[in-house]
């Protein structure tokens, strides 16, 4: 089995597509009802409620999720923080080294979906300083 995409349901496809276009530096492909943004390792799909209603009208609500984090591995978290400072309204977590060996920052998209940009950092071997 292969994960094809993570889909975000929104009230405004254009606003969310423009945000992710800036964040991911990829062009959205699609229409006002559904777009895809393909990265080197996966795809983010953005759709309006009308496209979800085709499957089942009660299947998803726009901007109702507070339990999923979209993780993106980047080369340099601090450079990404500088690049995104005018686009992102609030950073939930400024670039911070994590005990599991990554440097992470967290922020939200216009619908409130949580995004984690992280990069791997070297950790000292156990027992060494």
Pin down the residues of each PLM region.
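Conserved active-site tyrosine of GNAT-family acetyltransferases
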Residues: 16-21, 84, 112
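Conserved beta-strand-loop-alpha-helix junction that forms the acyl-donor binding cleft
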Residues: 10-13
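Short proline/glycine-enriched turn/loop motifs at strand-loop junctions of beta-rich domains
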Residues: 74-77
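Vicinal oxygen chelate
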Residues: 1-4, 25-71, 81-108, 119-129
């Amino acid at each position: 089995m292969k994960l094809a995409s993570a889909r975000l349901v929104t009230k405004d496809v254009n606003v969310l597509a423009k945000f992710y276009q800036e964040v991911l530096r990829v062009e959205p492909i699609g229409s006002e009802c559904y777009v895809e943004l393909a990265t080197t390792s996966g795809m983010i799909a953005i759709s309006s409620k009308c496209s979800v209603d085709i499957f089942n009208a009660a299947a998803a609500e726009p901007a109702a999720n507070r339990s999923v984090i979209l993780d993106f591995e980047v080369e340099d978290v601090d450079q990404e923080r500088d690049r995104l400072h005018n686009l992102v309204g609030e950073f939930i977590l400024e670039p911070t080294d994590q005990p599991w060996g990554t440097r992470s920052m967290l922020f939200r998209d216009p619908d409130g979906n949580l995004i984690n940009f992280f990069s791997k950092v070297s950790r000292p071997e156990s027992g060494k300083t």
